[in-house]
């Protein structure tokens, strides 16, 4: 049996060069590899193993947008991507052919699809499984096949549809696949997810099943697919892809905007939300004990309670809001691969800081993105001192939960919403980490600032709290607290529902209600309340027009889902990426030790994103050589 398993695993995990050769291995009796449940389970695990790891510092697309930056010496593949170093000869972070970085990377997702097809086509041969087990495992593989097609679609646009592994007798022409029209790929994904749903269990909540696909996950994923399907990049995209056609002259991207796609998105998202509610999911609220340093303030302060809700939101394992999480995170033992270690600040009093690198930093753009305490953008709040936001001021007694009373910090860092303080650290602010409450001192030479010319430093002067577990300690990798990376959570569905409804018929109470659920948990005023108040809003009534509300919804989404891997994809599907990703990166002057010199907005990096090229990733040149039926993406 052991020999069979080894052969089987070797069959599934082929070299990258063979990934889209969808002819099975030379082993004629493939069905023999599926005689026992043990082998079938190995096949299922292999199907899951191709899921990208967004908590890996060299594999995450979180770093590919304008959310985060690193010192030059710490460039990751995603940072290289956004600096304009992408190429077709050896694509950076390529899901089509796979890639490697520091000995790790991502295997081709076409290999993952092939692994799924292998299980789907053979699991019925297993002798020691019940029909119900076979159907459930097969349905999981069917879903994962749809998921991998979707990931390829949103990176490359038109892709080949690989629904089955071809027989060994297939001709050379049969295996030279072609790219399909984008709408056809979407329909295939919808149909494949639907095919999976009937055979899935309602909800996987047993300890050894966390992260495995169930009906709630499938319906929620279908919501996400439908939102992309309706969005400008994929719906009537004449702006960028008007000349991108196949050999028959057919446009790969449809050229006529179809508003009914938003109806589909609203329908699928409503169904997903109801499935979540029927299965007991809800927006997360912290129900544990506060840390000793917060014990008194927690019981007396709604602000501190909100910080706990938001700080543990994605870190409290398998909580009530998490619909789907990656059950195989990078982990504390993966050392140079761990994104949490890259963001974790160093303890200046620790004798070792092995797993606290302190060089993954939020950009100033992200610091400016979050709302004021009134729930308005900083440039829309009459009561916020927007024009002088880069100047410093003393922290008053009414701001002592936001920053250190009596200290001076930037006006930008004060009077902001709880999500800002939960997600981002700053000079003279607070940091809950290493099991302690730190009072941050971030100027050069200070306890949390850059030390001499070390390459471990926060280039913008901001630290990333959101992905760091408060109990993680950086003196060893074993002390990092692992958690499942959130792939889908309930807040996303509420915001997707609001987005779809607004695109269909404009503002309504139903749209406001969906957004307000997320805002209430964030501790900020309701959208229809604050945007109607001329004492606060510079543009009162902005929420009453479709265009105005669209802008509000987009910002709400970018705040709520910040640093989770959505921004790179959302800005592309909205066709806004070329506006955001082709701009400089700014931060504070972190090499300065004096206050007035430190609080200067300076250039810390440059991004490059070409509108006519970078919305799609390149197919590796060697793939085009091997398969003459493949057409390269525009301008690559």
PLM region spans:
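Membrane-proximal, proline-rich intrinsically disordered regions
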Residues: 16-64, 411-414, 620-636
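Flexible, polar/acidic helix-loop-strand segments at domain edges
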Residues: 92, 332, 341, 350-489
């Amino acid at each position: 049996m052991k020999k069979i398993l080894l052969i089987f695993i070797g069959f599934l995990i082929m070299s990258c060069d063979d990934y889209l050769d969808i002819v099975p291995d030379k082993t004629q009796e493939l069905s023999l590899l599926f005689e026992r449940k043990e082998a079938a389970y190995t096949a299922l695990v292999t199907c899951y193993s191709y899921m990208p790891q967004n908590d890996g510092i060299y594999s995450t697309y979180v770093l590919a947008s304008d959310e985060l930056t690193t010192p030059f010496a710490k460039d990751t593949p995603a940072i290289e991507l956004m600096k304009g170093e992408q190429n077709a000869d050896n694509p950076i972070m390529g899901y089509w052919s796979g890639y490697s970085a520091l000995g790790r990377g991502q295997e081709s997702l076409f290999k993952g699809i092939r692994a799924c097809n292998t299980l789907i086509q053979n699991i019925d041969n297993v002798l020691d499984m019940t029909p119900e087990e076979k159907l459930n495992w097969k349905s999981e593989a069917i879903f994962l096949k749809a998921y991998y097609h979707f990931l390829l679609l949103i990176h490359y646009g038109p892709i080949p549809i690989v629904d089955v592994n071809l027989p060994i007798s297939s001709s050379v022409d049969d295996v030279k696949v072609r790219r399909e029209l984008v709408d056809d790929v979407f329909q295939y994904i919808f149909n494949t997810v639907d095919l999976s749903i009937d055979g899935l269990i309602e909800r996987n909540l047993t300890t050894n099943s966390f992260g495995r696909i169930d009906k709630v996950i499938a319906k929620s994923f279908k919501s996400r697919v439908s939102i992309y399907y309706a969005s400008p990049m994929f719906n009537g995209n004449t702006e960028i892809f008007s000349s991108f056609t196949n050999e028959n002259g057919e446009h790969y991207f449809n050229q006529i905007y179809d508003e009914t796609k938003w109806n589909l998105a609203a329908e699928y998202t409503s169904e997903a939300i109801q499935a979540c509610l029927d299965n007991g999911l809800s927006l997360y609220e912290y129900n544990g004990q506060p840390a000793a340093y917060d014990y008194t303030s927690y019981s007396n302060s709604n602000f501190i309670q909100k910080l706990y809700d938001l700080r543990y939101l994605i870190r409290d394992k398998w909580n009530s809001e998490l619909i789907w999480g990656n059950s195989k995170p990078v982990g504390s033992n993966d050392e140079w691969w761990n994104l949490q270690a890259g963001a974790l600040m160093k303890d200046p009093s620790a004798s070792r800081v092995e797993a606290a690198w302190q060089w993954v930093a939020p950009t100033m753009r992200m610091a400016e993105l979050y709302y004021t305490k009134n729930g308005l953008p900083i440039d829309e709040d009459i009561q916020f001192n927007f024009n002088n936001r880069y100047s410093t001021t003393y922290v008053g007694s009414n701001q002592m939960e936001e920053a250190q009373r009596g200290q001076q910090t930037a006006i930008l860092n004060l009077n902001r919403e709880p999500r800002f303080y939960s997600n981002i650290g700053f000079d003279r602010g607070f940091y809950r980490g290493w099991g302690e409450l730190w009072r941050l001192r971030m100027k050069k030479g200070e306890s949390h600032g850059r030390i001499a010319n070390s390459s471990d430093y926060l280039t913008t002067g901001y630290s990333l709290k959101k992905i760091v577990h408060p109990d993680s300690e950086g003196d060893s990798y074993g002390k990092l607290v692992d958690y499942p990376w959130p792939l889908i959570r309930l807040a996303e569905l509420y915001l997707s529902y609001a987005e779809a409804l607004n695109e269909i018929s404009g503002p309504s109470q139903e749209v406001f209600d969906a957004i307000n659920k997320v805002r209430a948990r964030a501790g900020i005023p309701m959208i229809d309340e604050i945007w109607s108040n001329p004492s606060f809003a510079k543009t009162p009534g902005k929420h009453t027009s479709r265009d105005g509300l669209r802008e509000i919804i987009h910002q709400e989404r970018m705040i709520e889902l910040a640093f989770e891997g959505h921004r790179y994809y959302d800005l592309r599907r909205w066709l806004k990426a070329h506006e955001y990703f082709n701009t400089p990166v700014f931060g504070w002057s972190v090499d300065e030790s004096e206050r007035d010199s430190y609080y200067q907005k300076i250039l810390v990096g440059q991004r490059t994103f070409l509108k006519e090229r970078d919305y799609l990733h390149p197919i590796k040149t060697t793939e085009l050589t091997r398969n003459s039926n493949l057409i390269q993406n525009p301008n690559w």
